[in-house]
Amino acid sequence: MDVSDPTAVDALYEKTAAEYGRLDALFNNAGAFMASTPIGNVDWDDWRRVLGVNLDGAFLMARGAFRMMRDQRPQGGRIINNGSISAHAPRVNSVAYTTSKHAITGLTKSITLDGRAHDIACSQIDIGNAETPMTEPMKAGIPQPDGSVMREPVMDVRHVADAVRYIVNLPLDAYVQFMTVMATKMPYLGRG
């Protein structure tokens, strides 16, 4: 499914409402990236593709979940956005991905405020180097801020699932606004 397609997202929520009657949690985790590219060489189509999935898609999925959680009885639910470590510390030559993940922080904060009246809690989980196909190149080596190429450690993606499960299982009168889960030895502050 293309999360950046409003029609497809609306159809997903219509189907969810018809089949299940309610929605208690959304893990907003779709993501796209592009090859390491300095800003001066970023192609507009690549920029739009990354922002389309990472920001437009996150907005559309969150909006659909918010509407369903607001309109169901009893009201309420949880939206968990994947913000990434890049929401705090960018990688070199990653302007599209970094911009999209910084924007997720603003989206999370806005949903948090808008959701209070409807018992909708919104959290952001910032994940660093969970082992997925997207992080496969990290094991071989990726560019660092000092110009070197370094292998980066990854962690089992199950640790992310455990963190999401923890957030989802909290009662709606409590929430985690931001959580960071990352490989213990990954470069982070200063990206080196």
Annotate the PLM regions.
Residues 37-39, 46-48:
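Substrate-binding pocket helix/loop in short-chain dehydrogenase/reductase
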Residues 124-125, 143-189:
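C-terminal helical subdomain
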Residues 40, 89-95, 152:
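Active-site loop immediately N-terminal to the catalytic Tyr-X3-Lys motif
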Residues 62, 100:
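Active-site helix of classical SDR
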Residues 84:
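Residue(s) in the substrate-gating loop at a strand-loop-helix junction
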